Amino acid sequence: MTWNPDQYHQFKDARSAPARDLQALIPERPYAQVVDLGCGTGEQTAQLAQRFPQATVLGLDSSAAMLAKAGAQQLPNLRFEQGDIQELSGSFDLLYSNAALQWLPDHPRLLARLWEHLRPGGVLAVQVPANHDHASHRLLTATANEFETELGGFTRFGTAHGASPVLTPAAYAELLDGLGAVDITALSKVYPVVLPGAEGLIEWTKGTALVPYLSRLDGADAARFLDVYRGKLQAEFPGERVYYAFTRVLFVATRPEL
């Protein structure tokens, strides 16, 4: 996927609010090795490095464009690498991921794999969007189905209905309990966002949900895709003001000491 950091940061304040809440849930401990999975442009990674100066903090992301921006974050205990979350190696005292794991399938299996990289006494802290039932996502999947040939049958989650892998807070809590976690917190929170009509929703989704689709289309097909999607949004949201219930799931858990 080809990420555009400037497009993503068009709504920086709104997108940053859940991250602040996630960081507030992280307990104060003498972490030695910290990793930010899907670190993007690195602002939150730098915040972790500043908060835990005794720790070596790694920001991991698959996007070269995002990491190019992250390079502006300069701290002695901070470094960035390009890589795949699913190929993570090493062990860590804090596994942190804000708005990244929703791109990966099969969260029960994913969390079990990540748990293996968490040291005894370590903390897992995750935030994922849970907006897959919102009209903007449903209409995006409907548009993708109309462009099945151009997209080679691709839908974001590999099914005709574009089903999200994101679970409920209760389901994450149960999964973590099954892994032996303690001090589990799992919650859902709505961050209200008001956007300027359907066009505002287009700009919002260009930063995230549209990326895997537009990355697979050439210029002409991408423009047609946007036009079809825009038409669906305008029919659903004909007014000049769209209230968007920006819903997030946050969970934090500790691996017991040996």
Curated annotation (Swiss-Prot):
Which Pfam families does this entry report, sorted A to Z?
Methyltransf_25
Which Enzyme Commission number(s) are on file for it? Answer: 2.1.1.144
For this chain, the annotated S-S bridges are none
InterPro entries documented for this protein:
Methyltransf_25 (IPR041698), SAM-dependent_MTases_sf (IPR029063), Trans-aconitate_MeTrfase (IPR023506), Trans_acon_MeTrfase_C (IPR023149)
**Any idea where this protein resides?**
Cytoplasm
Does the keyword Transcription belong to this entry?
no
Q: Name one GO cellular component term.
A: cytoplasm
Reactions it catalyzes: trans-aconitate + S-adenosyl-L-methionine = (E)-3-(methoxycarbonyl)pent-2-enedioate + S-adenosyl-L-homocysteine
Q: Which UniProt keywords apply?
A: Cytoplasm, Methyltransferase, S-adenosyl-L-methionine, Transferase
The answer to whether the entry has keyword Methyltransferase is yes
A biological process term (GO) from this entry: methylation
Q: Origin, by domain of life? A: Bacteria
Q: Name one GO molecular function term.
A: trans-aconitate 2-methyltransferase activity
Gene3D superfamilies xrefs? S-adenosyl-L-methionine-dependent methyltransferases, Vaccinia Virus protein VP39
The cross-references to CDD domains, in alphabetical order and at most eight, read: AdoMet_MTases
Stored HAMAP family: Tran_acon_Me_trans
Tell me the function of this protein: Catalyzes the S-adenosylmethionine monomethyl esterification of trans-aconitate.
* Family per similarity comment: Belongs to the methyltransferase superfamily. Tam family.
Q: Which PANTHER family match?
A: TRANS-ACONITATE 2-METHYLTRANSFERASE, TRANS-ACONITATE 2-METHYLTRANSFERASE-RELATED
Protein's UniProt name:
Trans-aconitate 2-methyltransferase
